[in-house]
Amino acid sequence: PFMATSCCPAWSVMAKKEFPGFAPYISMTMTPMVLTARLQKRRNPGCKIAFIGPCAAKKLEASRRSVRSDVDFVLTFEELRGMFEAKSIDFSQIPDQEAQYAASAPGVGFAASGGVAKAVEEVIEKLEPGRQVKTVYAEGLRECRQMLRMARTGKYNGYLLEGMACPGGCIAGAGTVQPPEKSRRLLEQYKAKAPKSNPADSDYTEYLDIICEDEQSWDPVARH
């Protein structure tokens, strides 16, 4: 009756555990961490993958048997800051490097609540103009549970349900080092500099062939 996003591992695990009947409706799309890691492993055999971000749930995800060989290390921003402080590394003394803006603006927006649903809406509008897309999103596990309860009543039949375990989305993860609102403002600035305005135009779409080639050999468990 609906489809739920799978990019937040904490959300998808909660949904399948507390609402087992909804498991078939959770997208089979792999999380950004796993997908990026697997693509890089195929493009650069022998490389090591380190995920660095605000999400603590990525540690549990990376420990899964089906993911271990793809993601070698997971660090939160808080842990990384601690490592730099232990080595007396002062960021203010490090020369700036030009930022790389390879993702589309909606792709960058994935990190904030509502961003995944928005990206899907924009892609569908580009590919099939005029097609109605019904979406709803929840942030924080309390809201996520409420959204699923409403879905159980049939309120969201035909909807895309976006769930983010952390209020505010990934930018407000347990391993962040700054207030979520500041992160959101910086994220909006980053989005404004993105070279592509629609995910369908992203340069990364050329790697879809790699995904299709190995689709059947990839463990579906890792996609949740």
PLM features: residue spans?
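Iron-sulfur-associated redox domains of electron-transfer enzymes in respiratory
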Residues: P1-H224
